[in-house]
From Swiss-Prot:
This is Protein FAM27E3. InterPro entries: FAM27D/FAM27E. Residues 77-99 have a biased composition (Basic and acidic residues). Residues 100-113 have a biased composition (Basic residues). It comes from Homo sapiens (Human).
Length: 113
């Protein structure tokens, strides 16, 4: 068996430590249909890899915090909460308390000790 026959055999990589060490399984990163990927898909994958690498670099240098707090904004109001916060109720309170109590303009009082 000549060297070119070995190279032509798909299971054996020409870039290994030696030509005569066949790979047990040609391991692929993602997806078993990499041969059937379109150029656009390949470019998208490459772009995602690049972005991930950039993000990892930023994370390592402490520029971005990891997104661990992902459970925000998932609170659903109960019926009681909902009816307590209806617009009609707030309007009534506003009428009783005087106008513009919903704005934060005159909350701070200046006191000299």
């Amino acid at each position: 068996m000549g060297i070119f026959q070995l190279l032509r055999d798909r299971r054996i990589s020409s870039r290994g430590p030696g030509l005569h060490t066949p790979k047990a399984e040609p391991r692929r990163r993602k997806g078993l249909t990499t041969g059937l990927m379109t150029q656009a898909e390949r470019q998208k994958q490459a772009h995602q890899r690049q972005a991930a690498m950039r993000e990892t670099a930023l994370w390592c240098t402490g520029h971005i915090r990891p997104r661990t707090h992902t459970h925000t904004g998932t609170h659903t109001q109960t019926d009681r909460e909902r009816e307590r916060n209806t617009q009609r109720l707030r309007d009534r309170e506003r009428r009783e308390n005087g106008r513009h109590t919903h704005t934060y303009t005159h909350r701070h009082t200046h006191r000299v000790l």
